[in-house]
Amino acid sequence: MTRVVLGSASSGRLSVLRNAGIEPLVVVSDVDEDAIIAAHPSAPPDQVVTALASAKAGEVVTRLSHSDAADAVVIGCDSMLLLDGKLCGKPGSVDAAHRQWQTMSGRSADLVTGHCVIRLHDGEIVGNVTESSGTTVHFGTPSPDDLSAYLATGEPLWVAGAFTLDGLGGWFIDRIEGDPSNVIGVSLPVLRALFERLEVSVADLWSANGR
């Protein structure tokens, strides 16, 4: 039975997979994201997030036990917000998140997520596929008090673009165009397509990784 491994610490990505019938093994990736971004100074946004996703999945593969790597698919993802031609990652501080919201309030931007799925059999890589997906997010304009309160929760500090769709930040999203799971950090339609390329059935994954 094929084990699903999620190479991410994101509670949002974990929730998406759980709600879709899969309880993955979580192995948090350990890569230097800044170095990877710096190595792609002129690359298009989709290539940057895909490179990050590939690095994360590849790093996780190296740390799997023999039993976990016997029959598995390893998922790596990375999301960034494309606004005014610039990729925005996790703000990391209240001040940075506040500046981000000042820039994007009342505007639209694209949340771009890179996906990588690596297929393992008997500890060997037998498939490696990638894809990116974009969803347009139309932001509302939170009042100064609401924004301050939101920033104080800490939620937007460690997520791409300083917002969540599936959390408190959802109050300040007017609408989206595209796949909502992509905004949360892992697109189910993209994953399904990647699994199909690897000849892996979603139904089989439900059976092997069901909650």
Curated annotation (Swiss-Prot):
Reaction(s) the record says it catalyses: a ribonucleoside 5'-triphosphate + H2O = a ribonucleoside 5'-phosphate + diphosphate + H(+); a 2'-deoxyribonucleoside 5'-triphosphate + H2O = a 2'-deoxyribonucleoside 5'-phosphate + diphosphate + H(+)
The organism's superkingdom is given as Bacteria
List the cofactors. Answer: a divalent metal cation
What cystine linkages occur within this chain? none
Q: Which keywords does this Swiss-Prot/TrEMBL entry list?
A: Cytoplasm, Hydrolase, Nucleotide metabolism
Major localisation: cytoplasm
Recorded GO cellular component terms are:
cytoplasm
Question: What Gene3D superfamilies does the annotation carry?
Answer: 3.90.950.10
Q: Please name the Pfam families in this protein's record.
A: Maf
Record GO biological process: nucleotide metabolic process
Q: Name one GO molecular function term.
A: nucleoside triphosphate diphosphatase activity
Class of enzymatic activity (EC top level): hydrolase
| Compartments it resides in | Cytoplasm
Q: What is its EC number?
A: 3.6.1.9
Show the active-site residues. D78 (proton acceptor)
Task: Provide the family line.
Answer: Belongs to the Maf family.
Role, per record: Nucleoside triphosphate pyrophosphatase. May have a dual role in cell division arrest and in preventing the incorporation of modified nucleotides into cellular nucleic acids.
| Name this polypeptide is given | Nucleoside triphosphate pyrophosphatase
